[in-house]
From Swiss-Prot:
The lineage of its organism: Eukaryota, Fungi, Dikarya, Ascomycota, Saccharomycotina. It comes from the Eukaryota. It comes from Saccharomyces cerevisiae (strain YJM789). This is Outer kinetochore KNL1 complex subunit KRE28. One of its GO terms (cellular component) is kinetochore. Residues 128-175, 229-258 form a coiled coil. Acts as a component of the outer kinetochore KNL1 complex that facilitates microtubule-kinetochore interactions and the spindle assembly checkpoint. Kinetochores, consisting of a centromere-associated inner segment and a microtubule-contacting outer segment, play a crucial role in chromosome segregation by mediating the physical connection between centromeric DNA and spindle microtubules. The keyword Flavoprotein does not apply.
Length: 385
């Protein structure tokens, strides 16, 4: 029990350290996100204030008539930025048109008045004027298209970068939430383990008190030693079976995940094989829980052995003097090849011909039954359970 208590304390220490580490990291990430948001808003506000110094049409002051202008708080409301940007874009278009008109006049005068040979233009419909005007418009449109294309490209890059950044930020927050949930589940499991350990300690104390009331000290020592040996055996068996059961569940989960991933590629034959394998693992899990985990030292099965290279399973039935050996015909798609029932009689081991014939006729080359169903049925029938 001291070893179990020490293990629980170690688990509690590790969980506490992990929990503290996640809390510190999560708080640091949230603080960085909040600081980044404040800096972004500050940059937006600073940019608009800088524009306000050069342009009177930008007013970043709070619209509150009850306060003097000097007492108003300077701020920028992000919700109205889109509308304001549209207004500014319209104004910039007007400024652009005005600038282009002036530039057109500049080109016009440059090509007409600066020449040593002035052009004789009768009107705006004059061919030379029309040609020069078209050239100016072409240059204007070319420059405008290039600049607008660059602006749109930069805007798209900014939007994509912002979207990717937001997705990664949300993913980080979700990972911290999932980690917190996993830690809570670990605490629940640890508390459950602690309760089970306490119950086991109480049961052991009750058995100890009962033994101490015995008058025979030799029997007490012998019984204590026997119980201790049984406890060590059960602990090792429980650890081994728990590990094997965990591995089986992992294999089952891997098969399920693999089946989901390859569902689109081969939904016919593959799903049938995966389903059969999952069914086999489920039957193995139930068989293990029924005859080992739930019964513990009271199990009716002894010397359970699996010969993977031979495709063979062998075990004994306690108190019945039976030895059962089951051979498989194919490891990839196992079917029962042969069932051998041996019985210990005196000092000899003989074949139970009647049981052999019965079970072989029933299960040999039968594709509809799994080996674990066969094993469970044989045990139940021989032990009359």
């Amino acid at each position: 029990m001291d070893t179990g208590s020490a293990s629980i304390k170690d688990y509690e220490t590790v969980l506490t350290d992990i929990e503290d580490s996640i809390a510190v990291s999560s708080e640091e990430v949230l603080n960085n996100q909040e600081l980044r948001l404040k800096n972004t808003l500050h940059e937006i506000t600073s940019s608009i204030l800088a524009i306000n110094e050069e342009n009177k049409f930008v007013n970043p002051l709070r619209n509150d008539e009850s306060l003097d202008v000097e007492g108003k708080e300077v701020f920028v409301n992000p919700k109205i930025l889109s509308a304001k940007i549209k207004e500014f874009n319209k104004l910039m278009e007007l400024l652009k048109l005005t600038y282009l008109e002036q530039e057109t006049l500049d080109y016009f005068f440059r090509f007409t008045l600066s020449s040593t040979k002035p052009l004789q233009l009768d009107s705006e419909k004059d061919p030379q004027f029309v040609k020069l005007n078209e050239r100016v418009n072409d240059l204007k449109e070319e420059i405008s298209n290039v600049q607008e294309s660059k602006i749109e490209q930069i805007k798209a890059e900014i939007q994509e970068t912002g979207h990717n950044f937001a997705e990664k930020q949300d993913l980080i927050n979700e990972l911290y939430l999932e980690a917190t949930g996993d830690i809570e589940n670990c605490w629940d499991s640890l508390n459950e383990l602690k309760n089970l350990t306490n119950k086991e300690d109480k049961n052991m104390m009750g058995e100890k008190d009962t033994i101490l009331n015995s008058s025979d000290s030799d029997d007490f020592v012998e019984e204590t030693y026997t119980n201790w040996q049984k406890l060590l055996f059960l602990q090792k068996q429980n650890q081994r079976l728990t590990k094997e059961l965990k591995e089986m569940h992992e294999v089952k989960n891997q098969i399920i995940r693999k089946g989901e991933q390859s569902k689109k590629e081969d939904s016919g034959h593959l799903m049938a094989n995966e389903s059969e394998l999952c069914q086999s693992i489920n039957l193995l899990t139930k068989f293990w829980e029924k005859h080992f985990l739930l019964k513990g030292s009271k199990t009716t099965i002894l010397n359970f052995e699996i010969f993977t290279q031979l495709g063979k399973v062998q075990f004994e039935i306690k108190d019945m003097q039976y030895i059962i050996a089951i051979s498989l015909s194919d490891l990839k798609r196992p079917m029962i090849k042969d069932i051998t029932i041996l019985q210990k009689a005196g000092g000899n081991i003989v074949t139970d011909i009647e049981a052999n014939s019965k079970f072989n006729n029933k299960y040999r080359n039968n594709t509809k039954v799994q080996i674990f169903e066969v094993m469970d049925d044989i045990i139940s029938e021989l032990t009359n359970e």
